[in-house]
């Protein structure tokens, strides 16, 4: 095995990513993850998710940890509905969410 391949495997095995789990009141869940800012991401569920909980774990290796996640009413990240940081959050009342950002 080439040293560069071995190094890649070692780094891949130890790299962690931020994680955002979005829970809907009907039991559906969206799990997302990454190592850098997400940019705007649409959530493609029909019917739309009625979100009542979000769990954000921002820890990453090798990259600065993101501080914030945002949930939006509309696709394309318009109509900000909720913003928070690290933790497990209850959204009361539940709200319809169609997109998100992590940064």
Predicted regions and their residues:
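Classical eukaryotic N-terminal signal peptides for Sec-dependent ER targeting/secretion
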Residues: 1-9
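Compact beta-sheet-dominated domain cores in extracellular/mature segments
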Residues: 5, 14-103
């Amino acid at each position: 095995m080439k040293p560069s391949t071995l190094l890649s495997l070692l780094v891949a095995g130890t790299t962690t990513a931020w994680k955002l789990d979005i829970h809907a009141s009907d039991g559906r869940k969206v799990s997302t993850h990454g190592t850098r800012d997400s940019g705007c991401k649409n959530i493609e569920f029909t019917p739309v998710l009625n979100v009542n909980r979000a769990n954000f774990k921002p820890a990453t290796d090798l990259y600065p940890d993101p501080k914030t996640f945002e949930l939006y009413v509309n696709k394309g990240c318009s109509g900000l509905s909720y913003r928070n940081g690290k933790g497990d959050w209850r959204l009361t009342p539940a709200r319809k969410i169609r997109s998100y950002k992590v940064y």
